Amino acid sequence: MSALTALSIASEIFPLIKTGGLADVTGALPTALKPHGIAMRTLVPGYPAVLGGIENPQQVHSFADFFGGSARLLAARCDELELLVLDAPHLYVRPGNPYVGPDGKDWPDNALRFAALAQAGAAIGQGLLLGYAPDILHAHDWQTGLVPAYLAYSGRPAPKCVFTIHNLAYQGQFPYELLTRIGLPERAFSLDGVEYYGGIGYLKAGLQLADRITTVSPTYALEIQGPDAGMGLEGLLRLRADRLSGILNGIDTRVWDPTADELIPATYDIETIGARARNKQALQSRFGLRNAPDALLYGVISRLSWQKGLDMLLDVLPGMLAEGAQLALLGAGDTPLEQGFRAAALKYPGQVGAVIGYDEALAHQIQAGADALLVPSRFEPCGLTQLCALRYGAVPVVARVGGLADTVVDANEMAIATGVATGVQFSPVTAQMLAKALTKTAALHADHAAWRNLQINGMTTDVSWKNPAQHYARLYRELIDA
């Protein structure tokens, strides 16, 4: 097996900067690829959190004028990750998260900020750094969608480029007038280039021009070729269907390991799963819930948005609580949903607890202490929380969409009879069907043996990066050999 070098280009990476599952993927994939003979470095923006978290940064290139200011490339490490950091203070050193300011609005120069990241990635791929020539570029989501565009319109030899869609809903659409400012020629503004509904489509560019497209589950790869999930890009995705594949995400099973997790009160495995009771008690205390060992405790760890279906959860909450269930919710997002769950916590003291925000340690504690994890998403490219839930023995209750459908085995009669069920699915994705799923979950929870089987099946499911990394390694080698 010949050794390959790959450059991943991404707007976030765990553990340095994270707003969602993209960071978990880009943080775990390089390590997972090592056994396959692939050495992956990752190019990320020099946000303050990144610059403050890297080890031994060394300047390897400088730009006198790069998208409006001086910039430099730093080679650095973070734990096992090999990084290249685009240190451009005029673009990345600012408060807020990577995409929005403290006022909750997108940074007005996002088009330039992420064009810069993409252009730097393409340049590195084409030999910018002496002695480093990656065989493959791997770009992620709209923020790096221009990578294959810069390669395609450079007029120079270029490595193959894979583009991964983590969420088609975020598309990076900007006005045509920025074309020259981002360094693309007029000929790029065409239907088979970066043009999208009269503007520049960063995500569309990646889909149009990458050598291969992946998304993060087989079901989502099919869904996005239809009008319900295609978000206006289904026609292009159908045209490129022979270049599109779905590869499930994994999770970092060293970070998510109930046998050695330092963030939870009691560690456990399938032999000592009874220790989860201590975690449940601690979780109830943390969320101000009644100490009720037998109550069905649901956890939610989610962005609070329409996509995630949490408005439906508010609709069915009274019925769920009437059956004696409890809810521990961790998340942030749309103001009406934040207000709705805060109000529910006040209305149902002892039964509903809500922490608005994100807390990595608390996320681990929910997985380790909740009986079930709710993921009622209207669409879900892959989803990672349900994978963590499986690993931790929190039975996932999920909508039958995208990666949720691919990773959770519904507890229907056949699956229970054959001993393979790992959770509860519902479809179609409506409040009425969610309510039915909750009733079914309560019945399963009341049957101690059936519930324990669901937990053990989940905990013995392989949710690691082993299989996904194998698929990516095969894809890279197919591209190079083509």
Curated annotation (Swiss-Prot):
The kind of enzyme this is, by top-level EC class, is: transferase
**Which CDD domains does this entry report, sorted A to Z?**
GT5_Glycogen_synthase_DULL1-like
Name the family the entry cites.
Answer: Belongs to the glycosyltransferase 1 family. Bacterial/plant glycogen synthase subfamily.
Pathway in which the depicted protein is active: Glycan biosynthesis; glycogen biosynthesis
Q: What does this protein do?
A: Synthesizes alpha-1,4-glucan chains using ADP-glucose.
**Key words of the record:** Glycogen biosynthesis, Glycosyltransferase, Transferase
What biological process terms from GO does the record include? glycogen biosynthetic process
Catalytic activity annotation:
[(1->4)-alpha-D-glucosyl](n) + ADP-alpha-D-glucose = [(1->4)-alpha-D-glucosyl](n+1) + ADP + H(+)
Which Pfam family, any one, appears in the UniProt record? Answer: Glyco_transf_5
One term under GO cellular component: cytosol
Native source species: Rhodopseudomonas palustris (strain HaA2)
Gene3D superfamilies recorded: Glycogen Phosphorylase B
Q: Which GO terms describe its molecular function?
A: alpha-1,4-glucan glucosyltransferase (ADP-glucose donor) activity; alpha-1,4-glucan glucosyltransferase (UDP-glucose donor) activity
Residues given in the record as ADP-alpha-D-glucose binding sites: K18
Q: What is this protein called?
A: Glycogen synthase
Q: Does the keyword Glycosyltransferase apply?
A: yes
EC number in record: 2.4.1.21
